[in-house]
């Protein structure tokens, strides 16, 4: 609903037209992307649609493949959609076949490899992927559209020291050279910091 949860009534109404699938975002329209996704409401949608041919897909707060498998299993949806968890993390789906198998076979999550909990991506690899992304974007879209990639470059800048400062700089880039300069400066500063700390 707009500002309250109306899952049962709404899903029953949607099921009248027998859709192939219904995606439940797990937040009200008023919440948008704020607050935690309501997976209890998503599970309620799955319960309401259980004896139908309509697939229920859940969405919200899926930051690792293990989150996706756990939420799908707990809520009894037939699948999940991942959005913001993949931004700045194109390696998110690296273990997707293992995750799919874990969901289908209802595997004990504690037996899954650590790489599914948090993919091991070095800071160097993150920077390289970001640079590759910027280079490919500029080659395809050209300089006149380069501003459009700023927010995507910003998503790579999370969960490491000084990420916020680097993210702020990414919102001002105009071309690949700007990105390369910022990454080079960041790496140089990091090397100097590490040397001073040892």
Identify the meaning behind each predicted range:
Residues 23-27:
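Short beta-strands and strand-loop turn motifs
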Residues 1-3, 28-35:
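Short, small-residue-enriched loops and turns at beta-alpha junctions
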Residues 4-21, 33, 40, 44-58, ...:
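Alpha/beta catalytic cores of nucleotide-metabolism and tRNA/nucleoside-modifying enzymes
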């Amino acid at each position: 609903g707009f500002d309250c949860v109306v899952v049962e009534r709404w899903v029953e109404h949607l099921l009248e037209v027998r859709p192939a699938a219904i995606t439940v975002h797990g937040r009200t329209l008023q919440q948008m992307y704020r607050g935690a996704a309501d997976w209890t409401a998503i599970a309620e949608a799955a319960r309401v649609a259980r004896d139908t041919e309509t697939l229920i897909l859940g969405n919200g707060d899926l930051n690792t493949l293990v989150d996706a498998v756990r939420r799908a299993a707990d809520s009894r949806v037939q699948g999940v959609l991942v959005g913001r968890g993949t931004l700045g993390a194109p390696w998110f789906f690296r273990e997707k076949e293992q995750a799919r198998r874990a969901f289908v076979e209802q595997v004990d999550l504690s037996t899954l490899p650590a790489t599914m909990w948090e993919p091991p991506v070095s800071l160097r690899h993150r920077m390289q992927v970001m640079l590759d992304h910027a280079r490919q974007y500029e080659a395809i879209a050209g300089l006149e559209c380069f501003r459009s990639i700023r927010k995507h470059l910003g998503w790579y800048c999370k969960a490491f020291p000084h990420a916020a400062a680097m993210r702020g700089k990414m919102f001002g880039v105009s071309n690949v050279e700007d990105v390369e300069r910022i990454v080079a400066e960041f790496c140089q500063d990091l090397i100097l910091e590490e040397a001073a700390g040892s």
